[in-house]
């Protein structure tokens, strides 16, 4: 894109958002509040998607299959997309955009008795704005990390299977509609972890691991890992353990890769693992973090972007990179209320 055209477009985007304070722009809120939703972006962050999740009641019958879409190059307003096929909405699904398609993977369904069932479904939202069915996930998971490499390979990392947390790295080839298994991360199997992918590099942090026999079902993990993807073999990953990241959050952090900045950005989350209602597995109140931090891939170090970011959030469905900066779509606020807000994160 030519520079004058890009600057004009950037200005038009700036005028499409309202202002929060003196210099912090704010995106329009979604038509409905959702948490544990899956989010994705296309066209370099100009098209944003929020899919499924749970509404303000946070009950099994408030789980939705609705899709909300915003085209930043048009009116910069949210509108309803084609709902995700299926008899029930899902929670904790993962999504990524590649080849002008949104790939929606896994998640779990909840019934009236409170049972949670992880599903293998892969749904692909194509340019014609209809859903196609992709090949099922070999190891179905929920609350995993996903990211895209070379606009073709979608990496699904960790998550909770029917047998508990896993350390699998599963790779979906968008061109071939096929799955393969990549080098698993060598750390403790976890779900509710956070991370992203940029510049052939995966960074993942924290999550929940299986708890002790006489304690809560899940406890927090503090492990951080970096994986370098082989340039010739997308299934080969060289993993390295990283030092602890800034902040205290360990579960439900929003994360995502920024190819523009060569960083993986993280925001919010809680100190202890929790369910989709925001209730900790150990029965204690979960403290929501307001820290925004990032891993700088080029310089290979952590950096704190803000110790007191506005609109602290948990279960926000990941971070999407836009031309105005990274955004978090939906989730639960610090009072555990489900929100429709779209928060533009600070940049260092």
Set out the residue ranges of the language-model regions:
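Bacterial N-terminal signal peptides
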Residues: 8-16
């Amino acid at each position: 894109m030519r520079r004058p055209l890009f600057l004009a477009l950037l200005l038009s985007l700036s005028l499409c958002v309202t202002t929060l304070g003196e210099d912090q722009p704010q995106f329009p809120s979604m038509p409905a509040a959702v948490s544990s939703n899956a989010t994705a972006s296309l066209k370099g962050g100009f098209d944003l998607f929020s899919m499924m999740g749970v509404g303000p009641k946070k009950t099994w019958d408030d789980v939705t299959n609705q899709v909300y879409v915003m085209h930043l190059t048009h009116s910069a307003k949210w509108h309803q997309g084609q709902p995700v096929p299926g008899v029930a909405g899902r929670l904790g699904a993962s999504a990524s955009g590649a080849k002008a398609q949104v790939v929606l993977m896994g998640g779990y369904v909840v019934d009236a008795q409170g049972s949670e069932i992880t599903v293998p479904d892969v749904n692909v939202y194509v340019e014609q704005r209809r859903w196609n069915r992709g090949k099922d996930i070999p190891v179905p998971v929920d609350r995993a990390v996903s990211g895209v490499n070379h606009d073709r390979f979608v990496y699904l990392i960790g998550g909770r299977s029917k047998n508990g947390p896993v350390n699998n790295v599963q790779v979906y080839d968008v061109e071939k509609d096929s799955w393969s298994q990549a080098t698993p991360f060598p750390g403790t199997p976890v779900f509710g972890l956070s991370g992203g992918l940029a510049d052939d590099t995966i960074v993942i942090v924290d999550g929940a691991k299986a708890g002790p026999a006489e304690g809560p079902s899940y406890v927090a993990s503090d492990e951080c890992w970096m994986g370098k993807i082989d340039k010739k073999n997308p299934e080969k990953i060289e993993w390295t353990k990283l030092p602890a990241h800034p902040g205290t959050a360990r579960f439900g952090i929003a994360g995502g890769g920024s190819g523009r900045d060569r960083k993986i950005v993280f925001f919010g989350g809680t100190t202890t693992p929790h369910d989709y209602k925001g209730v900790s597995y150990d029965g204690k109140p979960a403290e929501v973090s307001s820290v925004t931090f990032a891993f700088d891939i080029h310089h290979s170090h952590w950096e704190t972007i803000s110790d007191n970011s506005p609109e602290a959030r948990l279960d926000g469905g990941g971070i999407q990179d836009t031309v105005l900066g990274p955004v978090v779509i939906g989730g639960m606020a610090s009072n555990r209320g489900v929100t429709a807000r779209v928060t533009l994160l600070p940049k260092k």
